Amino acid sequence: MGALLDILLVNTGDKYPAIFTDNIIHMLEKTGTKYDKIHIITDEQYEGVWNKLQLFRDFKKGPYLYLDLDVCIKGNIEHLQREELHILHAWWRTRHHTPLNSSIMSWSGDYSYYYKVFASNPEYYMLTYQGIDEFIYNLDKVVYKTYNPVCTSFNWHGFDEQWDVILFNQAYHKMTEYGPWSKYMLFDVEPNMDPITK
């Protein structure tokens, strides 16, 4: 049996209240997903999503599984562990500026290449690309692989319960409102309640 996963989360700035990190832990435990430790990056060194690149600077052993905070976990997700760096292929939408989605990533080993390139000229990369997905996709050196479809997007397909993971992404505020996802989450909401904001 291999080593247990370390779960990685990023919660910088004031976009997500602390309950969103607690919610991930709640869903992992509820689904019986086994892990060793949870690491949460809270140091806001850059703007918004660019802080996720700190993951590659700080975590060079593994195995790791990174999750965005705006996901609903319905089933055990240990099967998402990968040795080589894997990023989501956003099969659920048109390509836009990149076909990648970094809401879920897994790896073992040293992928600090991504952080080092970015840190060499962060202002340039933040102005040139809309986020780390486009940044990673456009680098000359390709050192990642993409998952086969392992999740879906609430924004594009609604709350499709056939998947173990549903991404909410820009609709993260819906997670704190009552819906079919509520039974999986920590947010204690009932029909006709106001959304949770703390």
Region locations from a protein language model:
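Catalytic core and acceptor-binding pocket of nucleotide-sugar-dependent glycosyltransferases
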Residues: 108-198
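Short, polar loop motifs at secondary-structure junctions
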Residues: 39-45, 69-78, 148-152, 170
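Short, hydrophobic beta-strand segments that form beta-sheet elements in well-ordered domains
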Residues: 34-42, 63-70, 84-89, 144, ...
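A short acidic, often aromatic-flanked loop/helix-cap motif at beta-alpha or helix-coil junctions
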Residues: 44-49, 94-95, 149-157
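N-terminal anchoring/stem segment of glycosyltransferases
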Residues: 1-49, 60, 169-198
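A structural signal for well-ordered alpha-helical segments within the folded catalytic domains
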Residues: 22, 50, 54, 130-138
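GT-A fold catalytic core of metal-dependent nucleotide-sugar glycosyltransferases
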Residues: 48-99, 106-107
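A generic structural signal for well-ordered coil/turn residues at beta-strand boundaries
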Residues: 100-101, 162
